[in-house]
């Protein structure tokens, strides 16, 4: 995966409005076409600008191991976990908003993979 697909999968800034976190996840997973053949088990959307997230690969992050970096700052985010439904258009999600640090993989100073939300 590359930086542009990372942005499609994981960045929503400013945050898209929805009636509640579950509806937000259902909407965003469909809008970004993230369930083409099966419902993705879990996906996290970060509500920060691409440049802020890109900084985690440099001065805004701490090297963890290999090409993984942990953000120094916490980001507003929504964690989406699949709770059923069918792909591509009716996958159902349980959304949990939060403000947490993230771990991402970087290549050439650009985020290419979302590893996890740090607790």
From Swiss-Prot:
The active site is at residues 10, 113. It is found in: Secreted. It comes from Iguana iguana. GO terms for cellular component: extracellular region. This is Ribonuclease pancreatic. Substrate binds at residues 40-44. Keywords: Disulfide bond, Endonuclease, Hydrolase, Lyase, Nuclease, Pyrrolidone carboxylic acid, Secreted. Endonuclease that catalyzes the cleavage of RNA on the 3' side of pyrimidine nucleotides. Acts on single-stranded and double-stranded RNA. Disulfide bonds join 25-80, 39-91, 57-106. SMART domains: RNAse_Pc. InterPro entries: RNaseA, RNaseA-like_dom_sf, RNaseA_AS, RNaseA_domain. It comes from the Eukaryota. Belongs to the pancreatic ribonuclease family.
């Amino acid at each position: 995966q590359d930086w542009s697909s990372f942005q499609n999968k994981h960045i929503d800034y400013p945050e898209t409005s929805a009636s509640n976190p579950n509806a937000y996840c259902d909407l965003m997973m469909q809008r970004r076409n993230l369930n083409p053949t099966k419902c993705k088990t879990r996906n996290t959307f970060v509500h920060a600008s691409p440049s802020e997230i890109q900084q985690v690969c440099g001065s805004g992050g701490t090297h963890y191991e290999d090409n993984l970096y942990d953000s120094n700052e916490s980001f507003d985010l929504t964690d989406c976990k699949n709770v059923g439904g069918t792909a591509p258009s009716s996958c159902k999600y349980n959304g949990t908003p939060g403000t947490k640090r993230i771990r991402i993989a970087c290549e050439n100073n650009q985020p290419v993979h979302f590893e996890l939300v740090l607790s």
